[in-house]
Amino acid sequence: MSPSIARRRPLLAGLLATALAGAVLLVPAAAEAATTCTSGASEGMNPYYILDNEYNASLATSSSWQCVWSTSQSGGTIDWGADWDWAHASPSTSSDVLAYPAAVLGWEWGWMYSDTGLPIQLSSGKTVSSTWDYTFTQNTSNTFDVSYDNWITSSSDPGDSNPQAEMMIWLDHGGGAGPAGSQVATVSVDGASWDLYIDTDNTWPIYSFVAASTTTSSSLTITDFTKVLTGSYGLNSSYYLSSVQAGVEVWTGEGQIDSNTYSVTVG
């Protein structure tokens, strides 16, 4: 059986540390431009930030760790990365995702920057697109997915309220990882085929588009995916796309992601 995703309530974007920080052994990443290994901390790359999101570190062994770094930036295009070594302290929690190191644009239970171009109302006709070229390395076998995670809110300024929905776009996965919910359709978006899963057994509904063919280089229009949901699956078009994130959900294993080219365009 594929592990089911235990959905998270992420850390406030502005926090530099949380109570989880003491739950991990922090091991520095190899000589990168600007690195943090502190749970909940981030590296700013305005309008993005790279978040060391270790939201389930309390379920991990004491020797587990994670680091994120910002490497370079040219306008709206950034180069960033993360590495980790995660293991569950108990088999009883092995189905829970432990962390999601990610590049964040927009809202994450708060705002880091005000000039992100987000949120946009889903009915506005505006487009949000992204390019992502990355290298994924497994030092040991990982249970993981490489994905976009997008928060949908009912308000343009949700504060610290929960979102109305979550939309994930999985580019790759392995080690038995599977999305939450059940598959309801296979759809074509941006010239590719995606298996759509919907989970309503959660605080908010989760929509997951899983690539039929995995890729390490993508150019996607994020709002083309929201159009599928507003057009056929009941997502309210008066809601807002408030956040675009790109990262790795890690259940277990030692690995690294190098995002060689990453950008989000709001137009």
Per-region residue spans from a language model:
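Short helix-loop boundary/capping segments
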Residues: S155-T223
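Long, compositionally biased interface segments
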Residues: S213-G267
